[in-house]
A protein has these predicted regions:
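Alpha-helical transmembrane segments and their helix-helix packing motifs
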Residues: 1-282
Length: 282
């Protein structure tokens, strides 16, 4: 007799098969569709980060509760991603499962990953313009803009090894959150499954290359283009943020974090779970 108290959860092997089918489906989409989905994902990621910045803007950074609440708020971006079915670079690296199955070539995988990254960047750029012209930078006596500057500045002083490691741990959490969401039978199930892993990576200061594509370039724009009244309200100056340059962002943060994100998602989650659960399948 069937146990009526048993949970109706997907078996691990079945989750791996679901992830592999999703990977193949994403790769099979047209380039235009992939780019538009990626643009939406970039917007959603920027929305989540904006929520996070709005919460921490006037709160002491030493308070653990601030990091916890900020992390919970940031989860909104990933909830939108999951609900709307968009393509984020850090989760799209899991499509390497389709390559290991022989469905696609490395060239196809790389083109798809680059297309998604470009789409994410385009979406972030569009939303960043909206934020800039909305005047949010000057809100709360410029505290919101100051929060952006300090958040971005803090990301620019990691060593290469630290950035890669933080990137690995970040996308490990992101892809595990996605993997856990495959267990859900309802929308509520999927959302609840994602909350803690995403909150962990944000509260712990792990590095996400697409999220950084929003906050660091935005901080660079503030440093170079913010009007004098902003600096007066902030009681600071652009000279206090010397690390916020495009070249330093690319070399010290973007590239090593992106490498870490790829390792965390494609290797530690996607390939490992495929090797564990799907290797014996024909």
């Amino acid at each position: 007799m069937r146990n009526k108290l048993s949970f109706d959860l997907q078996l691990s092997a079945r989750k791996a098969a679901i992830a592999e089918r999703i990977a193949a489906h994403k790769i099979a989409r047209s380039k235009g569709s992939v780019f538009l989905m990626a643009m939406s994902a970039g917007v959603f990621m920027a929305i989540g980060f904006t929520f996070y910045l709005s919460v921490i803007a006037d709160a002491p950074s030493s308070q653990a509760l601030t990091h916890l609440v900020g992390g919970l708020c940031f989860t909104l971006g990933f909830i939108l991603l999951a609900v709307c079915g968009t393509s984020l670079f850090t989760s799209s690296v899991m499509t390497v499962m389709a390559k290991s199955r022989g469905v696609i070539s490395w060239r196809t995988w790389l083109i798809n990953a680059l297309l998604v990254a470009c789409g994410n960047l385009a979406g972030i750029a569009c939303f960043s313009l909206l934020i800039w012209f909305s005047g949010l930078v000057m809100s709360e006596n410029a505290m919101w803009g100051v929060a952006v500057l300090h958040c971005a500045e803090g990301k620019m002083h990691h060593t290469f090894t630290e950035s890669v490691s933080l990137g690995i741990m970040c996308n490990l959490m992101v892809c595990l959150a996605l993997w856990m969401s495959y267990c859900g039978r309802s929308l509520c199930d999927k959302i609840v499954a994602m909350i803690l892993p995403i909150t962990l990576f944000v509260a712990s200061g792990f590095e996400h290359c697409i999220a950084n594509l929003f906050v660091i370039p935005f901080a660079i724009a503030i440093r170079h283009f913010a009007p004098p009244p902003f600096w007066q309200l902030a009681h600071s100056s652009a000279d206090n943020f010397p690390a916020l340059t495009v070249s330093h962002f690319i070399t010290a943060n973007l590239l090593p974090v992106m490498l870490g994100n790829i390792i965390g998602g494609a290797v530690l989650v996607s390939m490992c779970y495929r090797a564990i659960y799907l290797r014996q399948e024909p």
